[in-house]
A protein has these predicted regions:
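Short beta-strand/loop motif that positions the catalytic acidic residue
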Residues: 101, 107-109, 140
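A conserved short beta-strand
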Residues: 79-89
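Alpha/beta-hydrolase fold nucleophile elbow
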Residues: 51-63
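Short alpha-helix in the alpha/beta-hydrolase fold that links the catalytic acid
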Residues: 117-128, 140
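Serine-hydrolase catalytic machinery in alpha/beta-hydrolase-like enzymes
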Residues: 1-52, 150-164
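C-terminal catalytic histidine-bearing segment of alpha/beta-hydrolase fold enzymes
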Residues: 131-186
Length: 186
């Protein structure tokens, strides 16, 4: 099994009850990545101190905003075994430089996600290749944003967003992540 820690990356216990709030909170984090990195590293240090944690086998997993955030931390040289991003943002204002990425990366993406356009996928692959990253990207055809969230269809309808759950992509991405983590912790 694994020990998990959920980080409050928005800060101050903020919770988004509407997509506009989430956009505002996430935007504030993206505007100050040094603060985000400090917050992330504080959580990582707290996790390492737990008696049931093997600090030589660490991974970060994120969904949506969190998925983009774990990729940003990898680009900034996060020194852990693995990061996994589920329908996270692939774009960046600060592309990884060669030799910067120290962690293995797994990205699970909806090929029809308008929040992660095909050109962003191509740019991400080019960036990772140029950086010499050890990464995998699984692009699920016919799959939209939030494909791992069983409530995605309802939330998409409620807020007018292109969200759609995919039981198949959800199951496959989870299974692939399990294998990815086992391989990363060898």
């Amino acid at each position: 099994g694994y020990t998990a820690l959920a980080l409050d990356m928005y800060g101050d216990g903020k919770q988004a009850s509407h997509p506009d709030d989430a956009k505002k909170f996430a935007g504030a984090v993206r505007q100050n990545m040094d603060v985000a990195e400090a917050r992330f590293n504080a959580g990582l240090e707290l996790l390492k101190q737990q008696p049931n944690v093997n600090s030589s086998q660490l991974a970060a997993i994120g969904y949506c905003f969190g998925g983009g955030l774990v990729l940003a931390m990898a680009r900034r040289g996060l020194d852990i075994d693995a990061v996994a991003s589920f329908h996270g943002s692939l774009g960046t204002q600060s592309p990884a430089q060669p030799g910067t990425i120290k962690t293995r990366i797994a990205v699970f993406n909806g090929a029809d996600d308008p929040m992660s356009k095909a050109e962003q996928v191509v740019a991400f692959k080019e960036e990772m290749d140029k950086a010499g990253a050890d990464y995998m990207l699984v692009d699920y055809p016919g799959t939209m944003h939030a494909f791992t969230n069983p409530d995605a269809d309802e939330l998409g309808a409620k807020f007018g967003l292109p969200l759609k759950y995919s039981a198949e992509a959800d199951k496959d991405s989870w299974e692939q992540m399990q294998v990815f983590l086992k391989e990363s912790f060898k």
